[in-house]
A protein has these predicted regions:
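Internal, helix-rich recognition cores of eukaryotic regulatory domains
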Residues: 1-250
Length: 250
């Protein structure tokens, strides 16, 4: 039930299974070696995840998403009306028109986008995809939800420069300074900017922080009210352990 609620909250329409299978049949994407370097260690110490999700399943979903992002980038650069793996992507005629229009607009405005600004596979996407596979009843559902999240909700997180993540980290520092100036000053005195301790939490929307069942409940909240609220959740985690942080001799 959870995955269907997530799909609704993410406004992610279903797709035909054969569309996902076509992406899988394309074989190794340009990012495949990076994906394989990450998948084997994804939530490796979480027995619940390891029992339900196989490495091969995670690899297929990430590789399919990498192909879709690659084709979307080529569409922007070449000005295609509809990239090969995006056509008939389960959309209604109206949404398909909007998709084609957005690609045409992007082609006019973003054709000169540098490699650092391209949306593609980056390290950490494996952890971000993991809860979707854990909650989903099929790879297709996980693929649709994950792809929708990274392309519509937080595309800045998966650009080569990860500019969205770095902006989020600055927000963690800013919010913490407002909410708890003493804790913020203590961390700054130790040289502990959010870039050092909160990078993974921002990038993965706290999926890197066990236990997994609590991550799923957190995501229920984030998808309902906005993934940007993850910044406040990270600060809340710091507040919960503030005494331990301040009393720590290091």
């Amino acid at each position: 039930m959870r995955i269907y609620i997530w799909l609704i909250l993410l406004n992610a329409p279903p797709i035909r299974t054969d569309i996902y299978l076509d992406l899988v049949r394309q074989g190794a994407s340009p990012a495949y070696s990076k994906i394989r370097n990450d998948t084997f260690r994804t939530l490796a110490t979480d027995p619940l995840f390891r029992r339900r999700v196989t490495e091969n399943s995670l690899t297929r979903v990430l590789n399919a998403v990498a192909w879709k992002l690659n084709d979307a980038h080529e569409a922007r650069v070449n000005g295609w009306q509809s990239p090969p793996t995006l056509s008939d992507f389960g959309d209604t005629p109206e949404s398909a028109y909007q998709s084609r229009h957005s690609f045409a607009t992007s082609a006019r405005t973003d054709a000169s986008t540098s490699e650092a600004e391209q949306v593609g596979y980056v390290q950490g996407m494996n952890v971000l995809a993991a809860p979707f596979l854990y909650a989903a009843r099929s790879e297709v559902e996980a693929f649709v939800a994950f792809e929708r999240l990274i392309t519509r909700e937080c595309p800045g997180y998966v650009r080569g420069s990860m500019d969205g993540v770095h902006k989020g980290l600055k927000l963690v520092d800013t919010v913490l300074e407002i909410v708890d100036p003493k804790l913020f000053a203590h961390l700054m005195s130790k040289g502990m900017h959010a870039e050092i301790y909160a990078f993974a939490s921002v990038l993965t929307m706290c999926a890197c922080t066990p236990p997994l069942p609590e991550v799923l409940q957190l995501w229920d909240f984030l998808f309902a009210y906005g993934p940007h609220l993850n910044i406040l959740c990270i600060v809340a985690q710091l507040i919960l352990i503030r005494d331990k942080i301040i009393d720590s001799p290091r």
